[in-house]
Design a protein with these regions (language model features):
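Conserved, structured core segments of small domains
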Residues: 1-101
Length: 101
């Protein structure tokens, strides 16, 4: 397995109001099963807008597919960029997540 930092940025032309709220609900619902499956270590909003995720996937193609199908992307709310990284220093409680295949 490989590890990815996924950085999201809101689009300047993103929907506002109720359309944004609907996209947000869909975005949360989309990532919930991936969290349950162990693909997501954490995710959350940045104070500057949009958010970050740490993912564990088989490779760049899987990460890109997850990003492309995110309702924030399909709904024109945000763009995401994934960067692969190696986990060298790890908090002991997170060791199991990083070690699992």
């Amino acid at each position: 397995m490989k590890f990815y930092l996924v950085n999201g940025t809101f689009r300047e032309d993103m929907p506002k109001g109720p359309a944004f709220q609907e996209a947000l609900k869909a975005h949360h619902a989309y990532w919930a099963p991936h969290m349950q499956a162990g693909k997501v270590l954490f995710s959350g909003p940045k104070t500057s807008g949009a958010g970050l995720l740490i993912l564990k996937c088989s490779g760049a193609e899987e990460v890109q597919k997850l990003i492309d199908e995110d309702p924030f992307v399909t709904g024109g709310v945000a763009v995401f960029e994934a960067s692969e990284f190696s986990a060298f220093y790890k908090f002991p409680a997170a060791e199991q997540w990083f070690a699992a295949e």
